Curated annotation (Swiss-Prot):
<keyword id="KW-0560">Oxidoreductase</keyword>
<dbReference type="Pfam" id="PF01958">
    <property type="entry name" value="Asp_DH_C"/>
</dbReference>
<dbReference type="InterPro" id="IPR011182">
    <property type="entry name" value="L-Asp_DH"/>
</dbReference>
<dbReference type="GO" id="GO:0016639">
    <property type="term" value="F:oxidoreductase activity, acting on the CH-NH2 group of donors, NAD or NADP as acceptor"/>
</dbReference>
<dbReference type="GO" id="GO:0009435">
    <property type="term" value="P:NAD biosynthetic process"/>
</dbReference>
<keyword id="KW-0662">Pyridine nucleotide biosynthesis</keyword>
<dbReference type="InterPro" id="IPR036291">
    <property type="entry name" value="NAD(P)-bd_dom_sf"/>
</dbReference>
<feature type="binding site">
    <location>
        <position position="186"/>
    </location>
    <ligand>
        <name>NAD(+)</name>
    </ligand>
</feature>
<dbReference type="InterPro" id="IPR002811">
    <property type="entry name" value="Asp_DH"/>
</dbReference>
<feature type="active site">
    <location>
        <position position="216"/>
    </location>
</feature>
<comment type="function">
    <text>Specifically catalyzes the NAD or NADP-dependent dehydrogenation of L-aspartate to iminoaspartate.</text>
</comment>
<dbReference type="GO" id="GO:0033735">
    <property type="term" value="F:aspartate dehydrogenase activity"/>
</dbReference>
<feature type="binding site">
    <location>
        <position position="120"/>
    </location>
    <ligand>
        <name>NAD(+)</name>
    </ligand>
</feature>
<protein>
    <recommendedName>
        <fullName>L-aspartate dehydrogenase</fullName>
        <ecNumber>1.4.1.21</ecNumber>
    </recommendedName>
</protein>
<keyword id="KW-0520">NAD</keyword>
<dbReference type="GO" id="GO:0051287">
    <property type="term" value="F:NAD binding"/>
</dbReference>
<dbReference type="GO" id="GO:0050661">
    <property type="term" value="F:NADP binding"/>
</dbReference>
């Protein structure tokens, strides 16, 4: 039986926990103290609720972050300096170049592992392969409903209540998108990490009142040729900012743990 530590206890974390494959159990959940009573109740005291990785006296087989960019920044180094493998869904945290460098250095020094999950997008294996031959351009476009953009910087850039058709409200780099939209733009960061990097990856964000799905379009050109991917995914019912596929990518990470581990 493989035992994981979960960072987070929000909508995505709970979705992942409800879908853990056979052979994987959760031993620890790192979350704010306000969630600890709910964790104890949900798991009958069989799962240890933590506020910091230091409180874990055993070694998890995998630490799975399903919380936020802030959680990656706050706890990531503490995890990898213990030599624990850390899988992150909030990849936008790595738009902070200093944080990314610290995490990579800690992994080298302490035999840790930083695993970038694919999240809500497909084709990252092909993108990373294409990078080996040289990339000319990588462009990512995300289109979501007004509900998916509420509570984000989008509210300062466009009137979400008045929009009547699909409209672009942001164009810029993946680094800018990850910084301005920390709960919405992890896909942009994931694409950047597998492709041209945070500054050269171009991002366009749209709102469409007619859609109920999160649509991701990726266009890649390079010496290999070119490819385009379009993925129209359902958001989590419990959190419209989060794509169901992102949660499933975390579940699949757990399955890989059982089936023979990760290829980094």
């Amino acid at each position: 039986m493989k035992k994981i530590m979960m960072i987070g206890y929000g909508a995505m974390a709970r979705e992942v926990l409800s879908r853990l494959p056979d052979g994987v159990s959760v031993g620890w959940i790192l979350a704010r103290a306000a969630h600890h009573a709910a964790i104890d109740s949900a798991f009958g005291g069989q799962v240890q609720a933590l506020t910091h990785p230091d409180q874990c006296t055993e070694q998890p087989d995998l630490v799975l972050e399903c919380a936020s960019q802030q959680a990656v920044a706050e706890f990531g180094e503490a995890v990898v300096t213990r030599g624990w493998p850390l899988a992150v869904i909030s990849t936008g945290a790595l738009a902070d170049a200093a944080l990314q460098q610290r995490l990579q250095q800690a992994c080298r020094q302490h035999q840790g592992q930083l695993i970038v999950l694919s999240g809500a997008v497909a084709g990252m294996d092909g993108l990373a392969s294409a990078r080996e031959g040289g990339l000319d351009s990588v462009t990512y476009q995300a289109c979501k409903s007004p509900a998916s953009w509420r509570g984000s910087m989008a509210e300062q850039l466009i009137d979400l209540d008045a929009v009547s058709e699909a409209q672009v409200f942001f164009e810029g780099s993946a680094r800018e998108a990850a910084r301005l939209f920390p709960a919405n733009a992890n896909v942009a960061a994931t694409i950047a990490l597998n492709g041209l990097g945070m500054d050269a990856t171009r991002v366009r964000l749209l709102v469409d009142p007619a859609t109920r799905r999160n649509t991701h379009r990726l266009q890649v050109c390079g010496n290999f040729g070119e490819f385009q991917i379009e993925l129209s995914g359902n958001p989590l019912a419990s959190n419209p900012k989060t794509s169901t596929l992102a949660a499933l990518s975390a579940v699949q990470a757990c399955r890989r743990l059982v089936d023979g581990g990760f290829i980094a």
